[in-house]
A protein has these predicted regions:
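Polar/acidic, low-complexity leader/linker segments enriched in S/T/G and N/D
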Residues: 1-16, 178
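Amphipathic, non-transmembrane alpha-helical segments in extracytoplasmic/periplasmic proteins
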Residues: 26, 35, 80, 94-120, ...
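Short beta-strand-centered interaction patches in the first periplasmic/extracellular domains
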Residues: 68-87, 123-205
Length: 342
């Protein structure tokens, strides 16, 4: 069932006759939804920018960013984004030195909410992943996601329908590669319908040189090398973004920060092995869900690996409903490749 709340969350309406629905969530990114409805007084009154779309079955929630009335087709099209994007309504206005990623991210969010309504932060999981990073400036979600990517930590904004609040959470999913609850997506086992396998190394880099400037009289330039690959398997990138040592940083701390920047860059520029499959709509959310690590096997193509479910896409149209999963890093489009490598 799809429910649409008004902007101030005081009222909601059920949407039961959508012409088409596309909803997608990602493990550590902003997802989106596109919903097409017939134009009638009920739907017109239900839709407003800033309202919340909630799928009660798949536990997905989105904030409406825009909508369009088309009188020729007699439709209204709603465009929405996953509610973690609400954090980008706030900027990081004070310098934050991060060591433990989970507690550091929590502190950055808490100290920058500044009255953002109906948003809470979930409890700590006890993750021990560490970093050497300084967050200052930029939008909150955009700035924390690279650190989460390096540590393979997901983020989501869970909708608490009883209290009508958004709860921001960090999570890692379950390891479902072994034991009685193991999950295997395999063409041979008939558990990988519409299988697409992709291997993309177009942006792959495993060694990064990060240039920075010391805070001394001569403004000495330094370069920190991150990565240990050698020979033909070494793929290098030069990263110069005017990184400067802060007044309160020692040179050792600055070098550690540059190293962390290099690690985050390597985490983005990966060799992308991807399984894309269609699944039984009844299995998602019970047998496995976003963030879980599962096995992917294709004897015919010689592929066997453990992959995280990084994206889920639900589609409803005239042909019926289906769910597609992306396991592993999604393959880039040409535009995505340009954005990633700069």
């Amino acid at each position: 069932m799809i429910i649409v709340y008004n902007k101030d969350l005081t009222n909601f309406k059920e949407i039961s006759h959508a012409l088409s629905i596309q909803m997608e969530e990602h493990y550590n990114a902003i997802g989106k939804a596109i919903i097409t409805l017939p134009i009638d007084d009920y739907n017109i009154s239900a839709i407003e920018n800033g309202g919340i779309v909630y799928d009660t079955i798949r536990d997905m929630s989105f904030v409406i960013r825009n909508h369009k009335y088309d009188t020729a087709r007699t439709t209204v099209t709603v465009n929405a984004y996953t509610c973690n994007r609400l954090l980008n309504k706030r900027a990081i206005i004070q310098k934050n030195t991060i060591s433990n990623i989970e507690s550091g991210v929590r502190y950055v969010i808490e100290s920058n909410l500044r009255g953002l309504p109906n948003v809470e932060i979930g409890g700590l999981n006890g993750f021990t992943d560490t970093t050497e990073a300084i967050l200052y400036g930029g939008q909150v979600l955009d700035e924390i996601m690279p650190m989460l990517e390096t540590a393979k930590i997901g983020n989501r904004m869970r909708w608490d329908a009883d209290r009508r609040v958004h709860v921001f959470e960090l999570y890692k999913g379950r390891d479902l590669t072994e034991g009685i609850h193991s999950v295997v997506f395999s063409e041979e086992y008939k558990t990988a319908k519409d299988l697409v396998i992709a291997n993309d190394d177009s942006v792959f880099k495993n060694v990064v040189y990060v240039q920075g400037t010391l805070n001394d009289d001569s403004e000495t330039e330094i370069v920190v090398e991150v990565g240990t690959a050698i020979g033909d398997e070494r793929f290098e990138k030069w990263l110069d973004r005017s990184f400067k040592q802060d007044k309160e940083e020692t040179e050792s701390q600055f070098r550690k920060r540059l190293k962390q920047i290099g690690l985050e860059e390597i985490a983005r520029l990966v060799n992308r092995h991807t399984f894309a499959v269609s699944i039984d709509t009844k299995e998602y959310g019970t047998t496995y869900k976003l963030g879980d690590v599962v096995s992917c096997v294709s004897q015919r193509f010689g592929v066997e690996l453990k992959s995280r479910i990084t994206s889920v896409k639900y589609t409803l149209d005239i042909s019926g409903e289906k769910i597609n999963l992306i396991l592993g890093e999604p393959i880039l489009t040409a535009l995505g490749e340009v954005k990633l490598i700069g």
